[in-house]
Amino acid sequence: MSNCKVIALTNQKGGVGKTTTAVNLGVSLAQQGKKVLLVDADAQANLTMSLGYPRPDDLPISLATIMQDIIDDNPIDVQNGILHHGEGVDLLPSNIELSGLEVRLINAISRERVLKTCMSEVKKNYDYVLIDCMPSLEMLTINALAAADSVIIPTQPHYLSAKGLELLLRSVSKVRRQINPHLRIDGILMTMVMPRTNISKEVTALVKSVYGQNIKVFDAQIPHSIRAVEATAEGKSIFAYDKNGKVAAAYEQFGKEVADIGEKQRNKNRADRLR
C-alpha cells in the first residue's frame, strides 16, 4: 500500500503507557478496516509480550534478526518474521537480541537507516505501521525516527514527564534536520490521566499552553485504569478485555483522531502529486 503511514510512538521516559497505546491504537485502526503492523523496537519486548508471546527469546525470527541481515547485506524476508494476532493486527516481534544489535549499529554503514530499509520491505502491505520505541534516545530510537513519517508522544500528566518533552522535541528536530526532513509530530497523547486530581488538570493545561500552539494535543485522554494493565497481562487489547469501559472509549476516540490525521495527509499527498 503506497499510502502506508509509519508512526513512531516514542518518549524517552518509561512508564508512560507507550506500549499499551501501541497495542490499542493498532487494534482501534484495525477495527476501522485498516491493515496494521506493530513493530516492537524495544529489547525489553513489552509489546511482543503484550500481544500474547510471553517467551519472546524463543522466537526464531525477530526485528534484531532482520536488522542484522540488513547490516550484513544478506537477503531479507521480513514476512517470515511477522506474527498474526487474533484481533486483526500483525506484529514484528522483539527479544533480548535487540540490545546486542544496538551496539553493532554503531559501526554499521548508514546506521541510522537500517530500520528504514526493513520498513521499506513491508509497508506496501499495510495502511499503518506503528513502531513502539524503547524509552531512550539511543540509536534504535533514532532508527525509528528515521523510518517514520510521524511521531506520537504519549506522556503522563506529571511535571517530570512534561519537563522531559523538551528534550524529546529537540531530538525530533535534530533528526528532522539531519536525517529525515519529512518527519512530523502528529501530537501529544495524555495517558494515565486521573481527571479528578489537580495535578492531572494542571499538567495537562501546562502542556497545552506550552506546546499547543505548534503541536496538537489530542482531544482523547487515556484514563488511569487497572483494567488496561490486566488486559496487557492477558495478551489482549482493552477492546477485547473491557470493551464497554472508559479506557476502550478513550482509545476508540484516539484511534479516530489518528485515522483522521492520516486521511488528511493522504489527501494532501494526492493533491500534491496532481499539481
Give the positions of each predicted feature.
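P-loop NTP-binding core
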Residues: 1-275
